[in-house]
Swiss-Prot record:
Location in or out of the cell: Periplasm
Signal peptide residues on this chain, from the entry's feature table: 1-8
Family: Belongs to the CsgC/AgfC family.
Induction data: Under control of the CsgD transcription factor, part of the csgBAC/ymdA operon.
GO CC terms of this entry: periplasmic space
Name assigned to this protein: Curli assembly protein CsgC
Described purpose of this protein according to its UniProt entry: Plays a role in the extracellular assembly of CsgA into thin aggregative fimbriae (Tafi) fibers. Assembly may also require CsgE. Tafi are thought to be assembled via an extracellular nucleation-precipitation (ENP) pathway, and possibly also via an intracellular non-CsgC-dependent pathway.
Keyword annotations: Chaperone, Periplasm, Signal
Amino acid sequence: MNTLLLLAALSSQITFNTTQQGDVYTIIPEVTLTQSCLCRVQILSLREGSSGQSQTKQEKTLSLPANQPIALTKLSLNISPDDRVKIVVTVSDGQSLHLSQQWPPSSEKS
């Protein structure tokens, strides 16, 4: 097995399942953990466009099982071409586990 694939399989991670219909994006952040935990989940959504700025923040504590992808929430956003949007998902057990991932990835236009 490729070393990179093996490392990905052995590490906890946050991923985003994204679909788009016109200007409407549906974004589902998922977390997969190597060990189960009682984790604090924070989802921060920032948006800036011609109509102004908005920021929303969701926080909750979840009991997350190991080795299976868990959908954390479902976001549906109407994003115009001139809008700048950033979603940051953080999962932490307050000790050794701290994951954070941004959508869109910094290599994409936001």
